[in-house]
């Protein structure tokens, strides 16, 4: 892989217009030349951009849901796929163990290790017994006969379908019930739950990832940083060395010093979604219109003068025409709308935060996971008295174990004991283009109900301060869908050819 990067970097400095000629003349059959080239340009001259010309794909197995979120904080240069708690059940043991990070691997011993292990086993036992009970309750509350199915372009009630239609409807319904049960049951899983990740990216970003894992400073993250370093040395040896060089260690120490500037405290009052920073709508509209017109008109100052002279109704009419041009949510609003910025504070549960974080244009600032803000109860479990009591007891036990671990090992290690149900406040900056994409995508029926709630609340917050600009968010869906994946499952099965 390193020879390809060296070739592209050398090509950027060559007068020869044919990259093949450069390869044949300078690199073909000469691996040492490409390594020497990288050593000279990257290490001696400090040209870090050439580290973006080599790429690798890495599988990371059995990483906790504490550290997987640290990994996914690197938002530029790395792409991720992660095992989903929405579609994959965690009710089976592997080699006699549930899939959570073992106590010794996170640095626990003695009483804290026993309490932690007992808690995780209890949570996984409850999760495993809860899944079928939730499925049964969903089927009782929303039987298949209560739904219409659009199989041939003509929505009909289940009772009106022919035999083949009923078979397809039953298959779609079972998958939807299972998905909804997994959505509710995942609240029980602890942050120590293991996941698998596929990571694809360039050398420069892998350097940043290794340094971030070292900076985080818990046993799992430091162990993973060294494992990644050793694995990637075979792919781009001259580049990855920079991650843990003296220069790299200076960066790690600097980030750790920043993190220690303020003592860790928790507490406060948090709303589900709160817009905490925005600008005057008229000024923001003028900015958007100026950027929309810039490719087709005079200099920026001339455009701005013209727009300032516009009546508000004229400016609104232009935005309305853009709205009318959008026929579906995949027709994105465009870069000029990125100039409108917002800062939100969102308090959701840790399970939903994991989905929120995948939107890389949300610049998230977050805290360690804690039990201090209480926990959410998923809707189906809340309607089942016996199960909701078991659930609440398990959450209280998690709080007790968290405090035991925190007292001895600190807040960062104690995160592993916290279930996904616990509330997790974060702040993020975004812009109108990304907010439009997020709101329209995450308000679709098949989105997780917590993400739908966040998306709809964000829309309402934006609409309350920027009513004209909010009109561009055309495809927000505020409907109520007890089985949100049902229509998507029907479409999938119809496309697959039925049964």
UniProtKB/Swiss-Prot annotation:
Gene3D superfamilies: 3.30.1360.170. One of its GO terms (molecular function) is thymidylate synthase activity. One of its GO terms (biological process) is dTMP biosynthetic process. InterPro entries: Thymidylate_synthase_ThyX, Thymidylate_synthase_ThyX_sf. Keywords: Repeat. PROSITE patterns: THYX (PS51331). Residues 1-246, 271-476 form the ThyX domain. Belongs to the UPF0159 family. This is UPF0159 protein Ta1429. The lineage of its organism: Archaea, Methanobacteriati, Thermoplasmatota, Thermoplasmata, Thermoplasmatales.
